[in-house]
Amino acid sequence: MRDAYLMMVLMDALKEIFDLKEILKSPIRNKKVILFVSLVFILSLVLLYILVVNIKYFSYLGDIIFQNFQKHVENLKITLNEDNLHIILAIWKNNLTVCILNYILGIFSLFVIAVNSYILSYVLYKFGAESFIYLVLPHGIIEIPALILSASGGVLFNMGLVNFLINIKFGTKREVLYYIKESLKLLILSIILFIVAGIVEGTITFKIAKIMFS
């Protein structure tokens, strides 16, 4: 009887997690966590841009981080002569890796958020607003929310684990299950957005890059 009950609970949970309406409502229910992660991203972006512009050390550190980022992009083996499908698949692989890593890291995904803010602030400083608008914004307006959602999902998952392991106040099984379900809904939504962002980056942004660098 207990096994049958657990199976029924699991099936109900899976049905809820993959319900599109529930997935779309999840950001509203978890807006406080999402706003917190968004605030970390925005403040990091603004603060790091100010530091990069005004302090040479941060500009130098930005050089190192950006060079490592470029090496990572080169490892994807994307060139201006590649077909769109190859580019999109390579971007998807990279984006989904970041998405899952963000989720697994939980609260430590805020460090990933800060590093991405550093890269964006450095690109804006190094290449100017025009290049930033043309080469980052087309896919960035989708990719950045996806990054924030995956990090928010990771934070929620951590909250569920803390409740489970330490059994702090309100640490009931129902509370733990709620956190895990909500975190997975945000993860699924972030994956969807990362897929869309990859298509935009592999088509629109890529075409803009070809025009600018040809």
UniProtKB/Swiss-Prot annotation:
Q: Which Pfam families does the protein's record reference?
A: SpoIIM (PF01944)
Q: How does it sit in the membrane?
A: Multi-pass membrane protein
Q: Does the keyword field hold Cell membrane?
A: yes
Instruction: Say which domain of life the source belongs to.
Output: Archaea
State the InterPro entries in the record: SpoIIM-like
Q: What is its main location?
A: membrane
Q: Any idea where this protein resides?
A: Cell membrane
Q: What is this protein called?
A: Uncharacterized protein MJ0706
User: What residue intervals traverse the membrane?
Assistant: 33-53, 104-124, 132-152, 153-173, 186-206
Q: Which UniProt keywords apply?
A: Cell membrane, Membrane, Transmembrane, Transmembrane helix
Would you tell me the Gene Ontology cellular component terms?
plasma membrane
